């Protein structure tokens, strides 16, 4: 029991760090009146959007809460509410810091690059540590409540279902935040670029463009609030799925041993919060003035400290010796943890290779832009497809090594360790929107060239960190979903062995010569494509509306271009808020309803009865794998491809192939316009979609068993 309270203490420390860092960020200078005015507009827009988004989610949430309470009892419904509320809180607080840090970063950059870096990173670290801390506290405190105050057995079904529902609550927020935020940010970006850069020939973040404020609002709601919700969900879901597997695999152990093994994923999360906090103090500009180097110092320090920490935790909780009822040792689990950290490092490195301006892929797209728009798009698509190969091979190796060391539980521990670094990784990601906004504010407020140089350098790195963290989010989501699939499979076996009334006579057959399995695989495989298509279409529609609006303002107020009239920024923000909220509902329900639809459709087609149930459970299981396989590739190709397109444009803007305004630059802007919704809307939203499908299947089992 003491172990659980120590974990709570670790979670509480992350909140203490966040409070300390927030006060230090808010104490910084906010710059001149013009800068504060711009930042105020961005802040207002972001808050208005989030308020509306959360109200929409709340309506859906109340319905689901009532359904869960009816089918699975109030404890499970409360778990769902905890997951949703905490996930929403992490994104909301993080974004509120981010929209206050942007102007302070721009001001700090007027004195030194190091000052700007320190402020922007600190703002990011607040979001990062809140994500890890609140996710850990939510799962741990509810687990403590269930086993100590509600008096339930650690592996009882109510505990398992309540924790799965907590993951589902986080998932629901994350798919809405990712999709809605993505539609908003890219509608503004693409629409603003098409009229501003291409038609009117004005630079990015020019105050004359009516869509600029909306674009800066979008960075915060998409990359800060959206990413926070996404990784909060993966963190919570993986911890829960690992606990579910522990409850099943170690069912024969003594209650104390069982509790120790079930606490293990939480303890790994706890120690890694401490290592992430320590890691933030390593982020300092060195003699080389490399910003990416400074950030990587923090990441590497966190990784090395985590390696030691995870070893200590496993040794203290379960020892390195043999474990009860299974064939592997505690040492093997530690080795799986090492593999998890290695996979994290490799995926980050590979993503940087595909999206950084120093490497072949981005340079090849820039080179292709010289010959025109078509060749830019062709090369970009080629890179987006190529970028899936190496991450997939790394994930394959990770699965094979950990499975040979400690079976399915080994894969789960590796994934847990990978996710335990989420605090540091989200910090790198949330650094992005702060620097992006700082650059926008510096441009709009007309700050001197040398300040723009500093903010541009920070922003370029921010773009890379955003891409890199997306790679990590997808890899961990794929592995997390695999752990959830294992939980589905083991849960199914458990209910059949327990002879639950509904499961009598059920014998699922996952062999590939079962046509229902093939049908399930194909159905699961189509979901990420359909979902991605809905996301891309939504951005296209939103961008179209913005193009019309910006053209209207230029037409009706000719003084805008001369600088005598002020554009109406609020109109674009309002238009996008409505569009994003409307467009996010239907795609978000796709992964929630699919498993239920497949189950009952196949059950009816296969003739009902025990045979129908067997066919339906096999089809749903296969569907989950189908979603994981294609989802992983769709998400990686979209995020890496989109990131490469974006940075190819930046590479040309840095003075290669004719620089800004050249024909190559115009072609690169086209590529970037395609890459934007790829990397910031459809790609990242596939993550939560993969996990929701798996979680709904787990809850479906629980509901049928009741």
Swiss-Prot record:
Its cofactor is Mg(2+). Mg(2+) 1 binds at residues 189, 193. GO terms for molecular function: diphosphate hydrolysis-driven proton transmembrane transporter activity; inorganic diphosphate phosphatase activity; magnesium ion binding. It comes from the Bacteria. It is found in: Cell inner membrane. Substrate binds at residues 186, 679. It is a multi-pass membrane protein. This is K(+)-insensitive pyrophosphate-energized proton pump. It comes from Rhodopseudomonas palustris (strain ATCC BAA-98 / CGA009). The gene is hppA.
């Amino acid at each position: 029991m003491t172990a659980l309270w120590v974990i709570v203490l670790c979670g509480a420390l992350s909140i203490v760090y966040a409070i300390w860092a927030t006060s230090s960020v808010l104490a910084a200078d906010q710059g001149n009146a013009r800068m504060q005015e711009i930042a105020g507009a961005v802040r207002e827009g972001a808050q208005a959007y989030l308020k509306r988004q959360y109200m929409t989610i709340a309506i859906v949430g109340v319905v689901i809460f009532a359904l869960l309470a009816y089918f699975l009892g109030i404890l499970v419904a409360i778990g769902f509410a905890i997951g949703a509320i905490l996930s929403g809180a992490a994104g909301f607080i993080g974004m509120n810091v981010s929209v206050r840090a942007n102007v302070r970063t721009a001001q700090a950059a007027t004195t030194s690059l190091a000052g700007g870096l320190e402020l922007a990173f600190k703002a990011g670290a607040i979001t990062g540590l809140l994500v890890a801390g609140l996710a850990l506290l939510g799962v741990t405190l509810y687990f403590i409540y269930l086993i100590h105050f509600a008096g339930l057995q650690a592996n009882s079904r109510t505990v398992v279902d309540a924790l799965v529902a907590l993951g589902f609550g986080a998932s629901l927020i994350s798919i809405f935040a990712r999709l809605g935020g993505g539609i908003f940010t890219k509608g503004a970006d693409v629409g603003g670029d098409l009229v501003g850069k291409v038609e009117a020939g004005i630079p990015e973040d020019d105050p004359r463009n009516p869509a600029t404020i909306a674009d800066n609002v979008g960075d915060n709601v998409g990359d800060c609030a959206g990413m926070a919700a996404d990784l909060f969900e993966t963190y919570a879901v993986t911890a829960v799925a690992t606990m579910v597997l522990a409850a099943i695999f170690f069912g024969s152990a003594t209650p104390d041993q069982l509790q120790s093994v079930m606490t293990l994923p939480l303890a790994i999360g706890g120690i890694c919060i401490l290592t992430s906090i320590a890691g933030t103090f390593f982020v300092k500009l060195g003699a080389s003035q490399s910003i990416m180097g400074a950030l990587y110092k923090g990441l590497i320090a966190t990784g090395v400290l985590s390696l030691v920490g995870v070893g200590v935790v496993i040794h203290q909780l379960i020892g390195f010796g043999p474990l009860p009822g299974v064939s592997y040792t505690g040492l093997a689990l530690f080795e799986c943890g090492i593999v998890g950290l290695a996979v994290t490092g490799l995926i980050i490195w590979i993503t940087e290779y595909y999206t950084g301006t120093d490497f072949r892929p981005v340079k090849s797209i820039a080179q292709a832009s010289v010959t025109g728009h078509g060749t830019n798009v062709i090369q970009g698509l080629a890179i987006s497809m190529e970028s899936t190969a190496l991450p997939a091979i790394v994930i394959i190796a990770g699965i094979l090594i950990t499975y040979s060391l400690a079976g399915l539980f080994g894969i789960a521990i590796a994934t847990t360790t990978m996710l335990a670094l989420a605090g540091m990784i989200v910090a790198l990601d949330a650094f992005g929107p702060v620097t992006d906004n700082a650059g926008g504010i510096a441009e709009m407020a007309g700050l001197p060239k040398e300040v723009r140089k500093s903010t541009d350098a920070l922003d370029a790195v921010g773009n890379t960190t955003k891409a890199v963290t997306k790679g990590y989010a997808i890899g961990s989501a794929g592995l997390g979903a695999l752990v959830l699939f294992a939980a589905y499979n083991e849960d199914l076996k458990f209910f059949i062995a327990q002879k639950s009334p509904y499961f009598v006579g059920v014998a699922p057959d996952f062999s590939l010569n079962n046509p229902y399995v093939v049908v399930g695989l194909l159905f699961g495989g189509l979901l990420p494509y359909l979902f991605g298509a809905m996301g891309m279409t939504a951005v296209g529609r939103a961008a179209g509306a913005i193009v019309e609006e910006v053209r209207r303002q230029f037409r009706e107020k000719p003084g805008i271009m001369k600088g005598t009239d002020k554009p109406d920024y609020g109109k674009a923000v309002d238009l996008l808020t409505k569009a994003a909220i409307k467009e996010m509902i239907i795609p978000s329900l796709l992964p929630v309803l699919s498993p239920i639809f497949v189950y009952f459709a196949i059950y009816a087609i296969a003739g009902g009865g025990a045979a129908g149930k067997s066919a339906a459970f096999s089809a749903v299981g296969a569907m989950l794998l189908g979603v994981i396989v294609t989802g992983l590739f769709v998400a990686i190709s979209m995020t890496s491809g989109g990131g490469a397109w974006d940075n190819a444009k930046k590479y040309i803007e840095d003075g290669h192939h004719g620089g800004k305004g050249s024909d190559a630059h115009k072609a690169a802007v086209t590529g970037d316009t395609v890459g934007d919704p790829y990397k910031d809307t459809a790609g990242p939203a596939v993550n939560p979609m993969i996990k929701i499908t798996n979680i709904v299947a787990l809850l479906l089992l629980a509901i049928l068993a009741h």
